[in-house]
């Protein structure tokens, strides 16, 4: 008695070798006595248990390994950004109101100082 255990079968089968049996009994299969057959097999006679055939929609077919591939060249689409240092000259005016520290009330024009400041701006 040989045990047939296939991943497609809902439960394992025992098969008796055909050399021991008569030609009329060679094609007979016996179900394990301690298992419950699947519902699709219960309506069939117990002398002949058939293998359930999975539908093609459940079968996975792997793709061919030697498929024609179009090689797409890889290009670097990210441009390198170089920083440019641009000197910028800004005029900063400092307005200081000059107040005279005298007891007299006088009006004086505010003094304006202009300084040149150079800064670097990275663009």
Curated annotation (Swiss-Prot):
Keywords: Glycoprotein, Milk protein, Phosphoprotein, Secreted. It comes from Capreolus capreolus (European roe deer). The keyword Transferase does not apply. Residues 103-123 have a biased composition (Polar residues). Its main location: secreted. Kappa-casein stabilizes micelle formation, preventing casein precipitation in milk. Residues 100-123 are annotated as: Disordered. This is Kappa-casein. GO terms for biological process: lactation; protein stabilization. Belongs to the kappa-casein family. The record marks 58-59 as: Cleavage.
């Amino acid at each position: 008695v040989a045990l047939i255990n296939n991943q497609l079968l809902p439960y394992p089968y025992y098969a008796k070798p055909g050399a021991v049996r008569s030609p009329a009994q060679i094609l007979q299969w016996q179900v394990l006595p301690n298992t419950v057959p699947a519902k699709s097999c219960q309506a069939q006679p117990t002398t002949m248990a058939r293998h359930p055939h999975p539908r093609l929609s459940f079968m996975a077919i792997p793709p061919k390994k030697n498929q024609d591939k179009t090689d797409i060249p890889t290009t670097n689409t990210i441009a390198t950004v170089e920083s440019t240092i641009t000197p910028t000259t800004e005029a900063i005016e400092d307005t200081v109101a000059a107040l005279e520290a005298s007891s007299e009330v006088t009006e004086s024009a505010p003094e304006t100082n202009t300084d040149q400041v150079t800064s670097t701006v990275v663009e």
